[in-house]
Amino acid sequence: MFSLPALLIGACAFAAAAVAASGDGCRAGCSLAIAAYYFSEGSNLTFIATIFAIGGGGYQALLPYNPAITNPDYVVTGDRVLVPFPCSCLGLPAAPASTFLAGAIPYPLPLPRGGGDTYDAVAANYADLTTAAWLEATNAYPPGRIPGGDGRVNVTINCSCGDERVSPRYGLFLTYPLWDGETLESVAAQYGFSSPAEMELIRRYNPGMGGVSGKGIVFIPVKDPNGSYHPLKSGGMGNSLSGGAIAGIVIACIAIFIVAIWLIIMFYRWQKFRKATSRPSPEETSHLDDASQAEGIKVERSIEFSYEEIFNATQGFSMEHKIGQGGFGSVYYAELRGEKTAIKKMGMQATQEFLAELKVLTHVHHLNLVRLIGYCVENCLFLVYEFIDNGNLSQHLQRTGYAPLSWATRVQIALDSARGLEYLHEHVVPVYVHRDIKSANILLDKDFRAKIADFGLAKLTEVGSMSQSLSTRVAGTFGYMPPEARYGEVSPKVDVYAFGVVLYELLSAKQAIVRSSESVSESKGLVFLFEEALSAPNPTEALDELIDPSLQGDYPVDSALKIASLAKSCTHEEPGMRPTMRSVVVALMALTANTDLRDMDYHPF
C-alpha cells in the first residue's frame, strides 16, 4: 500500500518546497537600509534613536537622513523620520535554514516607556514597521511575558537590499509602512519614481502591492545623505538556497521520513482499533475539526466550498476577478452556486486571523453587518462573503467614479453603521470590538444601505463587558485610532472613537488625515480640524468651511452642527467620556426623524 522510496522522495520534495517558500533564500545582507518611522504624538528623536539602538551621537546620527528637520526639538506629528539600520540575512529560531532579510535591532528591557513586557508593547513603539506576531516568530521568549532585567528582544524589521533580476542600479532601500490613503504608487512618486517605466520597476520590487491602500510594507529605492543611489552589490542577492538551507532540507527530509514511518505504524494500529470498536471513518471529519471544537466556533452555519469550485469561479484567481488587496490577502469576485460573492484569499500563516473572523461571523447576524456565506481550507484559507455591489463609503466620499452623496443618504449611512456597531457592543455575548472602523470598511449596497465589513485580520477582540478594557497588540488605521490604542488598550470605546471620525468624514468628504500639500509634513487629523471649528467664536460659520462643498449648501445647518457635536463626543480623549453606541443610535434616529429621506429612492451614478 505504501512505497517507502516514494515516501522518502516525497518527504525531500516537501522539505525543499517548504524551505524555499518560507524565506527569501538570501545569502547575505547589506550594510544599510532605511526605515520610514511614522512620527506620532509623544515621540521624539531621542526615543527613536534609543529603540533603534543608534549609538555614537544618538539622535544626531538621524539628522543627515532627515535634512527637513531643522529643529530636533520640533517634529511635526505625521512626518516620516528616516532611520538607518543594518539589513542582515537572518534565520528563524524554529527553522534556521529558512532565511530572510531583516534588521535585528537589540531592544533593551525593561521598555524605555515602561510598563510593557509583551511583544505587543514592543511592537507598538515601531509604528507598523514590525508586528507582535513577527517578533514572536523571531525571538525565543514566550508571548505572554518577556523577562525584564538584562534580557533583550531582537526587533526584526523587514528590509531589502535590491534584486539583480530587477535592476543593478539600486542597493539602498526604504522600508515604508503604508498608512491610510497611501499606496505603493503615491509613495514611489513622493521619492521621485513617477514615469510608467519607473512605476513598473517599483512594482517588480513589490509584487502584489500595486493599488493596495493603507496596509502593508513597501520597499522604495532611496538616495543616501550625499544624494546618490547605492548600486546593488554584485552577487549580494539572489534566490538560490544558502548552504544552511540545503542542510536544512537534508535534515528536514530525514525527519519527515521518520515521522512518515511512525504515521504508517500508527495508521495500521488505528485501523485495528477502529474495526474492534466500529468507530466512524476519519474521512467524515472536516479540515476544521480542531477549529470547530474550539469554544464558540460553529462552522456548521456556513458552507464549506471546495478549492476546485473557488478556483474555477475566479478563473484561476485571475486579475479580472481581483477586486481588492489587504495586508493578509487578496479579494476576488465570483459567482458561487448562483450567488454573487466576494472571496478573501489568505495564506496559511493567517490561520489565527481566519479563525477569528470565522468565529465572529458565524455568531453575529445583522442587516448592517456583512454576511459570511462560507469558507474553504484547501491549499489556502478562504472566506466567502456576500458581494456588496456599490463600493465602500470612502470611494463615494472621495467620488472615485461616484456622484456626490445627498445629505439624507449620509445621515442614513451613519445610522446604519451605528446600528451595526451597537449590535456588536450591546447584543452579542461576549462583546466584540471591531478595531478597524473606517469609511473604507463600510460597504454600500444598491440602495445605499450600509454594512460593516473586514472583521478579521486580527482586528477583532472579545471583552467581557462594556466597561472592561483588554490589553492587546496595536491594530487599526492611523487617523481613526484613539489615544489609548497606542498602548494596546482596547474597549468598545475604541470603535466609538473611530465612528466619530467617520461622522466627520460624512460631513466633510475629507480623509481622516488631511494633507495640505503632497508632503506628509503638512498633515492634520479631521478630529483636530473639527474641534478647532467647534471651538471657534462662531461654530456654525467655521463648520461651513469644512462641510463637503458638493452638497452645495443643501443640508440643514442645525443637523450638521448636531452631527459634528455628536462626533466630538465620540472622539473625546477620555474613553469614559465617550457615549455608548446605543446612545449614538438614539441621537441619529432623532436626526433622521427630522431629515427628509424621500430622496433615498434616488440613486445617483
Curated annotation (Swiss-Prot):
GO biological processes: innate immune response; response to chitin
Keywords assigned: ATP-binding, Cell membrane, Chitin-binding, Disulfide bond, Glycoprotein, Kinase, Membrane, Nucleotide-binding, Phosphoprotein, Plant defense, Receptor, Serine/threonine-protein kinase, Signal, Transferase, Transmembrane, Transmembrane helix
EC numbers on record: 2.7.11.1
Domain spans labelled LysM: 174-221
Stretches of the chain found on the membrane's Extracellular side: 21-245
GO MF terms, alphabetically ordered: ATP binding; chitin binding; protein serine kinase activity; protein serine/threonine kinase activity; transmembrane receptor protein kinase activity
Enzyme class name: transferase
Subcellular location per the Swiss-Prot or TrEMBL entry: Cell membrane
InterPro entries recorded: CERK1/LYK3-like (IPR044812), Kinase-like_dom_sf (IPR011009), Prot_kinase_dom (IPR000719), Protein_kinase_ATP_BS (IPR017441), Ser-Thr/Tyr_kinase_cat_dom (IPR001245), Ser/Thr_kinase_AS (IPR008271)
Catalytic activity, as annotated: L-seryl-[protein] + ATP = O-phospho-L-seryl-[protein] + ADP + H(+); L-threonyl-[protein] + ATP = O-phospho-L-threonyl-[protein] + ADP + H(+)
This protein's record includes keyword Oxidoreductase: no
Cytoplasmic compartment spans: 267-605
Modified residues annotated as Phosphoserine in this record: S278
Main location as per UniProt: membrane
Residues engaged in binding ATP: I323, G324, Q325, G326, G327, F328, G329, S330, V331, K344
Residues of the Protein kinase domain: 317-591
Sites carrying sugar chains: N44, N154, N158, N226
Any coiled-coil regions, as ranges: none
Residues the entry annotates as binding chitin: G115, G116, D117, T118, Y119, D120, A121, P142, P143, G144, R145, I146, P147, G148
Disulfide bonds: C26-C89, C30-C161, C87-C159
Enzyme active site: D436
Transmembrane regions: 246-266
Signal peptide bounds: 1-20
Membrane topology classification: Single-pass membrane protein
Annotated family: Belongs to the protein kinase superfamily. Ser/Thr protein kinase family.
Protein name: LysM domain receptor-like kinase 10
Gene from which the chain derives: RLK10
